[in-house]
Amino acid sequence: MPSYRSILTVTTLAPGCRPEEVEQAARAVTRLESWDIAIASGQPRVTARFTAIDDAEARATHRQILSSVREIADVPRARLAAVVRGRSHYLAP
């Protein structure tokens, strides 16, 4: 089954929320292959890797992850990428 990445810039947490709840929110949507936290261009970025049958299912899962994480924190930017031979190829929304 193909792999995909939801790449989210995550900024301000909602009042009373803890940083680890961002990961919990993503994991509540689907089984994740991996989870990564990084700083990119001075902003916190999380990457949730998951599998899907095809691009359409991946887009639906990405939207669900984004919606779930937005209950915990502001997400000013989100992108979906297909993983092909270990490299990310961004998909149009």
Q: Each PLM stretch: what is its role?
A:
Residues M1-P93:
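Long, contiguous binding/interaction regions
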